[in-house]
Amino acid sequence: MSPWGGVSDLLPSKDDLNISEEGTTILFANSKGGVGKSTLALIASLGVATRYPEALVQLVDLDKQSTSSDALNNFANSRFEVVNAKKMLLDSGLPNNANISKHINAFKQDNQGRRFLVFDSPAGTEPLRSSFILKCDFIFVPLSVGDADIHATHKFLDEMQELFHYEGIPKDLCPKIIVLPNMIDTRSDFDVIRRNFIEYQIYLGRGLFFLNSIRRAFRRQGTDTNLHVIFEQSKDYWMWLTDLISGKESLPGTPDKLLQL
């Protein structure tokens, strides 16, 4: 039995995946710490594994502190792998782009069924030093409404565009960038984020409102009780996010300015 088996009652499994035979590569990233990258990456990965039990989901932790891998080791099984990516990092802690790219290529070339590769990146991620980003299908950028979060996210997105321009990647072939308003208190918080990114040619995802249960998501307790509470309290959000990752919900065409989903 899956260690998170009870969650499937809330996030029903699906067999109608609409994804590339090469699999899907997802990155949760922002240069700012404390915006919820790891938590969203972990819960989204488990959500995909729960809804699509025939697929392989691999979560790669790019943090030297092993935040994600330590939290999720007790959830790992034959279809949900948690990888500590020490071999994918340089001694400085920066990403080893060559090794990460090799891992992505090998994962995509593996023809053992449907696959999702999820990267959880640490605070301080610099796009101009992270060329492996170009191999991702989706880049989810979590942030809250604070001024520091918004300023850091502006810088992060600007560097992302510099990377695309430097590498000469056509606009329609760039990874899809989706900003995720996270742990917001009111609709006005969401509107503040929307106004601050209105000129960016990216997508604005749904907002996740503040939940105390998120803070307890991965406390060691031997069961999936905390996850069950999270999925119950915010089911629509996780259904939307996993549908987007799986390809069940497709994105509109490349936006000319901020496009709200």
Which residue ranges define each predicted feature?
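P-loop/Walker-type NTP enzyme "switch/lid" segment
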Residues: S20-V35, L42, L46-F119, A123, ...
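Structural beta-sheet core signal
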Residues: Q58-L59, V141, I178-P181
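Conserved ATPase-coupling elements of RecA-like P-loop NTPase cores
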Residues: D70, T125-F132, I150-T153
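Inter-motif core of Ras-like GTPase G domains
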Residues: L128-A148
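Conserved C-terminal guanine-recognition region of P-loop GTPase G domains, centered on the G4
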Residues: T153-K171, N182
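Beta-strand-loop-alpha "switch" segments that mediate conformational coupling across diverse proteins
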Residues: M183-N226
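NTP-binding/hydrolysis catalytic cores, primarily Walker-type P-loop NTPases
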Residues: Q221-L261
